[in-house]
């Protein structure tokens, strides 16, 4: 896993992202997500990674971040990254009403650049580990935590531990409440 205080690698990858229609309703669209745009526009970027969509523990964390309202902060960007395709990302975002981009790291290139590539998990290879990263506006990784087992019910969860780092950066972020026993 990438070390804290390291420079975060930039990436451009396909993603499912929220998009506002002209009538004010939100839809989702396929896009290319460029990390540098988020880093330039925010004080911090949180990247939550998962080996695949619909992994219950990862979903619990993504939903907790959604419910904490991190996506609505002007000084914070949230990105989820999974080892699945855009099509799975669309279904996942719709099922759990996720209001932040979901990057499709189908071949593991982004995960590899962050040293978060799992050799294999449940018969899949070259997929991301479950992790949470906080990147500040200077491209410094300020927080990095990964789980050896994506199904581990970490207490506190990495997204909860990341809250303190966000506050140190100056981002007023509510601490997410991760409920692993939800309807995932």
Place the predicted regions along the sequence by residue:
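Chalcogenol-based redox active-site neighborhoods
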Residues: 1-184
